[in-house]
Amino acid sequence: MSSSVAVLWVATSSLNPDPMNNCGLVRVLESSRLFSPCQNQRLNKGKKKQIPTWSSSFVRNRSRRIGVVSSSLVASPSGEIALSSEEKVYNVVLKQAALVNKQLRSSSYDLDVKKPQDVVLPGSLSLLGEAYDRCGEVCAEYAKTFYLGTLLMTPERRKAIWAIYVWCRRTDELVDGPNASHITPMALDRWEARLEDLFRGRPFDMLDAALADTVARYPVDIQPFRDMIEGMRMDLKKSRYQNFDDLYLYCYYVAGTVGLMSVPVMGIDPKSKATTESVYNAALALGIANQLTNILRDVGEDARRGRVYLPQDELAQAGLSDEDIFAGKVTDKWRNFMKMQLKRARMFFDEAEKGVTELSAASRWPVWASLLLYRRILDEIEANDYNNFTKRAYVGKVKKIAALPLAYAKSVLKTSSSRLSI
């Protein structure tokens, strides 16, 4: 269930993955060859730490709002204090926020006019425009709603978001695509090495070239990209999560990372009085909310794959087990359990809304639209009487269309759902 894209924050709703491509990339990752025989072919159609000092009040407040089951600080068997998943993730947030603040202090920094660093591209640099165009085609083909939202952005931001989307999609395809059975940890190691080269301005193919150009233009940190790959490693070896702390880390890896990747491109409103750190916290919260929504929507589908993406300790507290999920029967125990899970996801959406209002004007509308639509999936789960075993909750076309003017109003008025609602 490694849904990796949430319109950037949010394109998780649009993933319909295909392998990163069917032109030999898996073979290249498994071998020592430098180039795939058809590295620049079009994607085929198919399926879907520098440690800062911690604020104890921040840990306490987030734990209370989000309902984290475990304590913030945990003693290891050796007596050392281990960081909770939220703390580990927050360290990445601080690092990215510091990078953006450093760029903003530079008088030469302008998101839409800054010239990129030179990117070493196999062949002619004139292919860079074609690379971005291809990324746009992939978005249009597999994430139609998200793609339309990107058209509201400035041309430079739009292209950069396309490039990030495509990289996330290709990464997700490693473990969720048709070739997933051939992927090994070594293949992911090679994919990460390729990422490192990309950030050094040495892309492997034309789609990598678009992202290499993007990270040269914008203050995007490499750590969220590494962390997404770590999420793919987790999916290869893990199908159960003992508590919400474990699940939170997984959700960050496969979806929260996308928010950290994309906010430097989307930009923060110059008039915003919010701290950069708080905006990134909200972006992270939206990624977590989207992934939790995916998990709650796809319980039955995941169970048929032998996977349970629900906290084992909370299932036990509700008098439930994996066997109940595999049986697929909606009982009062299941309804009560689901009510608590939906409540938690909505709390993350609430936290995310605080940051959407602080984004640049050109980015707010598409993010609001995606947030509102994804949040409605939780309502549909309730409407299905919590039957997420045999029914897949989705938002119909009429409701999608109805959400657009509301999202626009929110983006203009810079308000949250507490003042406007569907």
From Swiss-Prot:
Instruction: Identify a single GO molecular function assigned to this protein.
Output: 15-cis-phytoene synthase activity
Membrane listed as a keyword: yes
Q: In which pathway does this enzyme or protein participate?
A: Carotenoid biosynthesis; phytoene biosynthesis; all-trans-phytoene from geranylgeranyl diphosphate: step 1/1
Membrane topology label: Peripheral membrane protein
Q: Which InterPro entries match?
A: Isoprenoid_synthase_dom_sf, Squ/phyt_synthse, Squalene/phytoene_synthase_CS, Trans_IPPS_bact-type, Trans_IPPS_HH
The reaction(s) annotated as catalysed by this protein in its Swiss-Prot or TrEMBL entry are:
2 (2E,6E,10E)-geranylgeranyl diphosphate = 15-cis-phytoene + 2 diphosphate
Q: Which residues form a coiled coil?
A: none
The protein's location, in the record's own words, is: Plastid, Chloroplast membrane
EC number(s) from the headed UniProt entry: 2.5.1.32
Q: Which family does it belong to?
A: Belongs to the phytoene/squalene synthase family.
Q: Which domain of life is it from?
A: Eukaryota
This molecule's function is given as:
Catalyzes the reaction from prephytoene diphosphate to phytoene.
> One Gene Ontology cellular component annotation?
chloroplast
Q: Which PANTHER family match?
A: BIFUNCTIONAL LYCOPENE CYCLASE/PHYTOENE SYNTHASE
Q: Know the name of this protein?
A: Phytoene synthase 1, chloroplastic
- Oligomeric and partner information: Monomer. Interacts with OR. Interacts with ORLIKE.
List keywords of the entry alphabetically.
Carotenoid biosynthesis, Chloroplast, Isoprene biosynthesis, Membrane, Plastid, Transferase, Transit peptide
Which residues belong to the transit peptide? Answer: 1-70
Q: Which GO terms describe its biological process?
A: carotenoid biosynthetic process
